[in-house]
Amino acid sequence: MSTAAGSRKKHSKLHNEERADITKDEFEAIREALSKEEFRKLFFDYVEEVQDPENRKIYEQEITQLEKERGVDIKFVHPKPGFVVKTSIDGELKCFINIASSPEVARPNSEVGMNPETGGRGLSWSIPMAQTGGRDDCDAKNNHCKVFDVVFHPDALHLSTRDSQFRKALIDTALDAVEREYEVALDRANLKYPKLDYKGIARPTVIRKLAANPTPEEQEPHPLEHMYPTKPPASNSEPKILPMKTKAAPVPEFAVPKYSIKQSHDVDLSEYTDELDAKLHVTVPRSLVVEIELPLLRSTAECQLDVTAKSVYLLSERLGAKYRLKLDLPFVVDDKAGNARFDTEKRRLSITLPVVRKSVNQQRQMHDTLRYLSREDSGVELHSNSESPVEDDADGDMPETPELETAAPPDPPALTPSTFLKDSVHYQLPKFDCNALDNAMAFVLDVAHVQPDSIVTLKTDRSVSVKFATIGSGYYPTHYAFYMELPSVDMEEYHKDHCIESIEAEAWDNNVIMKLFLGAESKAPTSYLAGLHANGLKEYQVYGHYKAKTDKNNECEPNPPRVVQIMRTDDAVVITVRPPHTSITTEEDDEQQQQLHKKPSKKQRKRNKKQRSYSESACEEMLDQQDGPLGRKKDATTPMVPQRKQRSYSECNDSTIGSENVNRGILKRFSRYGPRPSMSDSCSSIDDCGFSSHSCSVDASSSLFSQSFNGIPEEDRTEEGLSESCKKTVRFNDQIMKQVFRHDSSILGQRKKNQKRRNCKLRAQQRRLSEGDSADYEETRDTALKQQGEPSGNKLHDSGLDLTGASASHRTDNNSKSYRTRQDHADADAKNDAMMFEMDDEDDEI
């Protein structure tokens, strides 16, 4: 797109539109001088003297002599009239080219040559020429125009009158010279040859060359060198030779006129509001204004104009004014409502075409779509009180609102798996996860801020498709799609029972949950196929199956009868639970029963409070007992040592024990993993539920994984019913040890300091003892030091389970000996503790 104003500025120098640099005083002086009769007479005499041919000849001789003194030979070229070519510059300014002659220009010559394309013989011409500077002039209507002179030898003009091809070559040479020298574009499609020999007044030009043999005086610099024209360089002594043209320049049949497209827009105050749809049509103009420059036409009666919704076509076949223009419009226009106007003074055609905008219904639909895209994802529909501006009709009257019809809208076309996803929309596969529960499957699609209205589902007997969209911070929608298909099985009954009955899809803040419900008699499959669409599916496994809880599952199976023994001591109550077949007691059991009647020491009380766990030997026995009946028959000959688990309860349940001064536990709930036993509301802690329907003891022989064992949830089972927690035990000490290191001291220095502190404390305790107590303390201290040297005595703790197995019979004697050793150590500890308690009591009394 270009404008006429820009092209006029481009040729301002050619038009000589520069204003004269004259002051106001100078202008007044010239005006006063011209008002005098004497000055006017002298001025006219000067003009006549300059235009006199004799005086001009004398002037040329003087100039030639002056230039010769500077070492420059000059020749005055006086162009003689020939013929005139009329055209235009850049399709705007009228231009005349004078084809003149002068004997001062060299003769044209020719050489025999070969045509490189056809191979035919011909003549290759060399045509010398001379050019004058362009000058401004006026045409017959006193309009501004431009005039150029191109001078050839008289023989060249004589040949042009006899040979039409030579004449055409002469004209092309003159046009090329003007375009190359003045950097303009001439209209070669509309050349005219007026009946003129010469346009304007002939003005001579000068050919300047350096002298061939200058004298020493001529080579000396002239005192007025700065006032004369610059000497021509020595390289220009020879005429400039242009490359020979082997192919004629193509001459277009029609010229393309200059044009411009302007977008016209009215000022609408509704576009300056804060509505979301206020500036929807800011970039859409009300109309398009197309301006076409036609300087060679007097009216539009000689041209054809066709306007369509997207283009403009102009054609002029008049001789000397051939124009053709095919223009594509940037907007759809109403060709029936346009108008055209031709300016005869400026030779300009203006076409005004209104732009077709969308209808009111389409604009309202676009407004609703924009509101939907810009809605905040807060879970609550936002309704704005302000409505979008309503477009008025052409007559300006508001249309009457017709009565609403009760006709139901047409049903949308049925979706199929092939047409469910649009080809023009790019879909992404979201991250997903699957959970199964009986005959239901739940898919969690990890996509946040999903628009609930954008969720569309498609269900078949064996597959489900879902698509939805989410809006980002830039109001740009992102589309997602998910396709799930059940695995194919050849059985007809399987297909009949395992079919998808219904689906539910719900959008949350951070994801989308889709639920699939299969037949009532079917179960969730172990695998499924998923992907973006039906092509390129991938198989996924369902890792977790969960069964819904029923009343039958909640009912506890009756435990086999067990033998329960309750022994009450001074400080605690010991409950022993044994299976009915473990009635045989061993020597170790008798010793343990005797030990229970004794007063427990401080360490024993702490040990009894610790929670016991399974050992590896007990787990091995569970695996053996979990074998089939053949395993039981095979191990029937092996003597089975009765298995037990003892737990000491404080008297916390009045309904079972009926004692006073109870210490209740702080554990208020069971483990989060595994099944929970049913407890009555009257139990305030786990200790209150000791005699509930779920026993607190663990019987490995009858119930390998009873409901009272709340451990780590099992993941991979090597045997059915056996948890991996049986093979891993963790014991925690009640005493918390803390070691603090100072940053400005070494560890060894702190160790010595702590050892010194302990020695001081020990000496202080010795000073408090009497003579008899000191002796007992020394004996007790020696015994304690010996026990520290034997780590096998104090570091072994009873886990509360009788370790039985294949090697249990071989270690019966060793166990009895180690038990006696531990009993001796326990007696010594009890004695030391009693002595320390007595010392504390004496200190309190003091």
From Swiss-Prot:
One of the GO BP terms on file: cilium-dependent cell motility
Keyword Phosphoprotein: yes
Amino acid composition bias (Acidic residues), ranges on this chain: 389-403
Keywords tagged on the record: Cytoplasm, Phosphoprotein
Top-level taxon of origin: Eukaryota
Subunit structure, interactors included: Interacts with Pp1alpha-96A, Pp1-87B, Pp1-13C and flw.
Pfam families in UniProt: PIH1 (PF08190), PIH1_CS (PF18201)
Annotated function: Required for cytoplasmic pre-assembly of axonemal dyneins, thereby playing a central role in motility in cilia and flagella. Involved in pre-assembly of dynein arm complexes in the cytoplasm before intraflagellar transport loads them for the ciliary compartment.
HAMAP family assigned to the protein according to its UniProt record, in alphabetical order: Kintoun (MF_03069)
Similarity annotation: Belongs to the PIH1 family. Kintoun subfamily.
GO molecular function, one term: protein phosphatase 1 binding
Ranges of compositional bias, category Basic residues: 596-612, 750-766
The organism's taxonomic lineage, starting at the top: Eukaryota, Metazoa, Ecdysozoa, Arthropoda, Hexapoda
Protein name per Swiss-Prot or TrEMBL: Protein kintoun
Gene: Nop17l
Basic and acidic residues: bias regions: 821-832
GO cellular component, one term: cytoplasm
UniProt-annotated stretches for the region Disordered: 1-21, 372-416, 581-657, 743-846
